[in-house]
Amino acid sequence: MEKIGGVFDEYVIILCYDDSRDNTLKILTDYVNKNSRFRLLINTTLVESSCRTHKIANARNHCLKHMQEYFSNYKYFIMMDCDDVCASPVNLEVLKNNMKRTDWDGLSFNSSRPYYDLWALSMKHLVYSCWHFSQPNTHQIYKDAIQHLFRTCPPGELVSVYSAFNGFAIYRTHKFINSCYDGQSRLDLIPPFLMEQNKRICGEITPYYWGGPDQDCEHRSFHLRAIFNNDAIVAISPEVLF
């Protein structure tokens, strides 16, 4: 995170902590004491839900609210997962070069291993959750579709999508500052004609494949709101960042 922050003239790192059964909080607190750029938010407004995406959306919104209140004048903000997906060496030149472009407002990246984040992905003809259609066919359809888009993307161009994350994304603040994350299935945010295209390819919508209460990837609502409210342009760079 600090290496990425060094690309900018000024930066802060905002992390939201809610609960754990290990020494995560101590590790984070020790780091705060060593780095004045680090903002640790202790989230006391936990959601009463067993759904993972509902909890993650709550934490991401907590970070977003802090940014809205204190750093809304920043030109960019980054949402980044803290797992092994972003643990590989980062290619800062890829980030720097893409920041010179003007054809995106929200940008994520390809990865060195097969593209994993299919749940956050909304493509032009496959806009809804890959886990809300019959399996295993739909998961493979989405996997094949994104790989086809990468293969056929002209050199130097970006892949246009409605939503994508893949562990890391950078946003132009003024286009996403008033959006928010939602881990619920927000079919009301998807235009009917796009939903019909999706169903023609994958069949009718089914209950959430992994069982339990219904949920959807929180990134989809975040991106769709910005697209339809602020004309945001969401894209994926075929280049590998991590």
Specify the residue positions occupied by each region the protein language model found.
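Short, acidic, metal-binding catalytic loop of nucleotide-sugar glycosyltransferases
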Residues: 1-10
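A conserved acidic beta->alpha catalytic loop
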Residues: 3, 16-27, 45-48
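Conserved donor nucleotide-binding strand/loop of the catalytic core
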Residues: 29-58, 62-65, 69
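Short glycine/serine/threonine-enriched helix-capping/active-site loop
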Residues: 43, 107-110, 237
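Short beta-strand-to-loop acidic/aromatic patch adjacent to the donor-nucleotide binding site
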Residues: 65, 71-87
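Conserved catalytic core of nucleotide-sugar-dependent glycosyltransferases
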Residues: 84-203
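Active-site donor/metal-binding and catalytic loop motifs
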Residues: 174, 198-213, 229-242
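Short active-site alpha-helical segment characteristic of glycosyltransferases
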Residues: 218-222
